[in-house]
């Protein structure tokens, strides 16, 4: 098994890292911490609505959790938290290719992360906030643990890592970013996310990226990828699969 080692707030990839696990132990209540339930009856707790009701005293008011468009369900793992409208979890190389080609003229941000990467965990809430304040930008999340071969084919060797794509321009920039260098991400978002009219269809992945994914067997031809391959001179799947970098 390979491992992801943490250097500062970046995670350098040499393959897979096991998920970190925390030991859990039951805590004991001290006698002075106990409650006299006869004197202070407890009202029922509505965990479905995330509302905690304290003692049944008329002066006590329940605490209501704040709501937003960012998914923060109880028990949800940190990398599963996302906006409801413009953040999508990529499931395969074909899913990635199709999502980029179907984005039209929208700016698309590929967010490469790993559940075991501390830098990714620290940065993720900021990315969710930026996604919420930039609804016209599409954020595609790529889990390196589940799509390791694809990430290697896309030359992603450090996390967190981002690639920006825009319409007919294709890839416009790529870089590693941490919570300490979040301004780099914000500047790229402002620069490439401004309103513009792109002439031509969305380009998506470039030729080298497509070739790399095909060479490791990650990419299977469908109508969209076949159309993209024909634009660079490959008319059959056999020709595309044998494309040399």
Curated annotation (Swiss-Prot):
PROSITE patterns assigned to the protein according to its UniProt record, in alphabetical order: THIOREDOXIN_2
Family matches, as InterPro entries: Thioredoxin-like_sf, Thioredoxin_domain
Residue pairs linked by disulfide bridges in the UniProt entry: 117-120
Main location: plastid
Keywords in alphabetical order: Chloroplast, Disulfide bond, Electron transport, Plastid, Redox-active center, Transit peptide, Transport
Active site residues according to the UniProt entry: 117 (nucleophile), 120 (nucleophile)
All residue ranges annotated as the Thioredoxin domain in the record: 93-194
One GO cellular component term noted in the UniProt record for this chain: chloroplast
Location within or outside the cell: Plastid, Chloroplast
Transit peptide: 1-92
Family, per entry: Belongs to the thioredoxin family.
Xref: PANTHER family: THIOREDOXIN, MITOCHONDRIAL (PTHR43601), THIOREDOXIN-LIKE 1-2, CHLOROPLASTIC (PTHR43601:SF17)
Function recorded in the entry: Probable thiol-disulfide oxidoreductase that may participate in various redox reactions.
Name assigned to this protein: Thioredoxin-like 1-2, chloroplastic
Record organism: Arabidopsis thaliana (Mouse-ear cress)
